[in-house]
Amino acid sequence: MATRSVLLALVVLNLLFYVPPGRSGPNVYIQKIFASCWRLQGTCRPKCLKNETISYFGVILYICGCVNPKYLPILTGK
């Protein structure tokens, strides 16, 4: 009886973790949120574009915070 329950649990877990090959991965909107930073105005990429500045460093090997300067707050003081 116990082995039957364990086998059933393994089958159910296997089916829960199965991802169909045609449409695997997170949806486009979720990818956009997780690949962005600075209140969704910046992006994480290996190098910033010419008109962007680095606001902070994030994930290793990626610069997280490539933001257009018009979205950055005005700095006060030195």
Swiss-Prot record:
The keyword Transferase does not apply. Keywords: Antibiotic, Antimicrobial, Defensin, Disulfide bond, Secreted, Signal. This is Beta-defensin 135. Disulfide bonds join C37-C64, C48-C66. The gene is DEFB135. Belongs to the beta-defensin family. GO terms for biological process: defense response to Gram-negative bacterium; innate immune response. Residues 1-24 form the signal peptide. It comes from Pan troglodytes. GO terms for cellular component: extracellular region. It is found in: Secreted. Has antibacterial activity.
